[in-house]
Amino acid sequence: MAIKVQYNKTSLQQLEKQLKVRVRTLPIIKNKESALRMEVKRCKSEAADLEERLEKQIQAYEAMFALWNEFDTSLIKVNDVHLGVKKIAGVRVPLLENVDFEIRPYSLFNAPKWYADGIHLLKELAHTAIEREFTLAKLGLLEHARKKTTQKVNLFEKVQIPGYQDALRKIKRFMEDEENLSKSSQKILKSQQEKRKEAEA
């Protein structure tokens, strides 16, 4: 990283301050990255479990496939999905709190006996599918945040901190060289003045 530097004490102090900020911030960002990595892993596992549960529910649904031709699908519909927001390692993610279903009244005497079980099965199926979608959305947000945090860690570790250290080293060398030149020029001037005094005397 090419850092624009001025070879003076003010620039030196500013660069030291910026370096300290990055060195102090790096462990915090690393902790956030590891927390996000763990959360992504947990979220992937949760998504896989929900996928498996959804497959089992679909298989149970397909087992009664012949009966579903009689079922009135307009009896049940999703009325509302209640959302929440949760912060995970500083990242706001959606949280499924509840799913409200609207069940139209039907005649218990005229409808087949298994309708109640069918409605229950459809509720479970819909709830699991909605929960899976929320988990996948959460996973996407967490993975994006983890990638950004990893990029920031790499930027600090591999580019900015070494860049600032290099710039500080250059400024310090320049200032030391300038000081040495100043001292040596003073010595030369002093020795020339002494030679003149000796020549005059």
Report the location of each language-model feature.
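Charge-rich amphipathic alpha-helical interaction elements
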Residues: M1-A201
